[in-house]
Amino acid sequence: MKNLLSVVKISVPDQVYLKDPETSDLGKRIIENSILLIDELGFDSFTFKKLGTKIGSNESSIYRYFESKHKLLLYLSSWYWAWLEYQLVVETFSLSNPKEKLNKAVAIVTNTVAFDRNFSHINEVVLYKIIVNESSKSFLTKEVDSENKEGYFEIYKRLITRLSDMMLAINPNFAFSLSLASTVLEGGLHQHFLQAHFPSITNCKNDKTPTDFFLDLIENALK
């Protein structure tokens, strides 16, 4: 898998950027440092002016890649979901047992993230913190319906569909596979958020993980 990942380019919908940041050193520095700066300041306090100062480039140069910080957040979110989807596909491809395949997939999408050396300009551990804390801001907007029609969220929705299909492979009569799959994907983030900020209102602590919770939930739902 490591050798395969090293030659793979994670694809992001081209609607979210003006120029592909992966095509230049400046673009990669924009992505690398935007992740670090959003984590440091929070998305609301993050600006292209501050990012320009951090990377030693004019603010206007960043606007050649992204028309707004909203589009940048959409890019980061899409990159994360595409990276996660690729891991899911590779790790489950050879598994023939439907339950084993689903359990593996759930573990991948609900576990904490480890650093991936295949993408040196992207710190996936820090990016994951942004996804947990900030990614909902990419779609909780007035423009969500139009952006959805334009394909901004295709990777996110495709990942949910993959989980749903795995559930139906176990129980074809289960009527709520998409609802459960989307709950797993978003709920995994939410449980990690609760662990970090509101530990008194989650059972996912000590030796119990969000993965344990969702595996138990799915097993009971698919009976």
What role is predicted for each listed range?
Residues 91-125:
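Hydrophobic alpha-helical connector segments
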Residues 100, 127-169:
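Amphipathic alpha-helical packing segments from all-alpha helical-bundle domains
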Residues 44-71:
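Helix-turn-helix
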Residues 1-11, 157, 161-172, 182-223:
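C-terminal peripheral helix-coil segments that are non-catalytic and often amphipathic
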Residues 1-11, 21, 124-129, 134-140:
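Intrinsic, short, N-terminal disordered tails of RNA polymerase sigma-factor systems
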Residues 17, 22-47:
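Short, amphipathic alpha-helix enriched in basic
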Residues 32, 36, 72-93, 104, ...:
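Alpha-helical structural segments
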Residues 83, 87, 116, 134, ...:
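A short secondary-structure junction motif
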